[in-house]
Amino acid sequence: LNSDPPRRARVPVSFVLINSEHGSDESVIEALKGALSGEEGVEYEMQGVYGVYDIVLRLSSDDAARLRSIITNKVRRIGRVQSTLTMMVIEEQGS
């Protein structure tokens, strides 16, 4: 009898730090919501933050290649996004 809790299936997760033009945080967040809302099977959450970056975006999907495509073809192409820093979570590490 195994008393270890069952392992949850891991899905690819990315955190994207976004720099936007000064004063455009809210409009970028709204544009992100519009761009991502039609993506079936993709979960996301975002928040404006203080510091070097303006917005933190968390994306998850069952396909890492799809996440990369969304970041490249949707997130980075939103007007007023000046730069991004993407961190793909290493699925084999952590809890």
What label would you give each PLM region?
Residues 1-95:
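A compositional/biophysical signature of low hydrophobicity enriched in polar/charged and small residues
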